[in-house]
């Protein structure tokens, strides 16, 4: 089976598919940015994904196929992240600048998010953890399914 478009997202309408048998394509976040790939479901079914250029990244809960009784969805593995809880705008700016110098991407969340606070989240890196410890910025290391994948930051001088 070749998947050429995303049919929706399970998280946006969970009740609509409650009676469907769910088959999962389990992916690390690094593969969410690939629009052409071969995958295998947790039931051993092989699928080809060939999404058109300009299609957004895959997301947790994306529906790849559906019929009257079955649904195949993307299930994203948790990512090892640092949840940074800067106490002031100055502290956040200094940390964000340091992450930018390392060409690390960060995602930002407000108090209404699942984090319950204004936080900055980046992929785990031991040098960033050492930096946060040395400057005394509060953080937690967690495993999280991120809403969008971290992308490799291109860089030139």
UniProtKB/Swiss-Prot annotation:
SMART domains: UreE_N
Keyword Ribonucleoprotein: no
InterPro entries tied to this protein: UreE (IPR012406), UreE_C_dom (IPR007864), UreE_N (IPR004029), UreE_N_sf (IPR036118)
Entry-linked CDD domains: UreE
GO biological process terms on file: protein folding; protein-containing complex assembly; urea metabolic process
Family to which this protein belongs: Belongs to the UreE family.
Upper classification of the organism: Bacteria, Bacillati, Actinomycetota, Actinomycetes, Micrococcales
Keywords of this entry: Chaperone, Cytoplasm, Nickel, Nickel insertion
GO cellular component: cytoplasm
Broad class of where this protein is predominantly found: cytoplasm
Function in brief: Involved in urease metallocenter assembly. Binds nickel. Probably functions as a nickel donor during metallocenter assembly.
Transmembrane portions of the chain: none
GO molecular function: nickel cation binding; unfolded protein binding
Annotated localization: Cytoplasm
The UniProt record lists the keyword Cytoplasm: yes
Protein name per the record: Urease accessory protein UreE
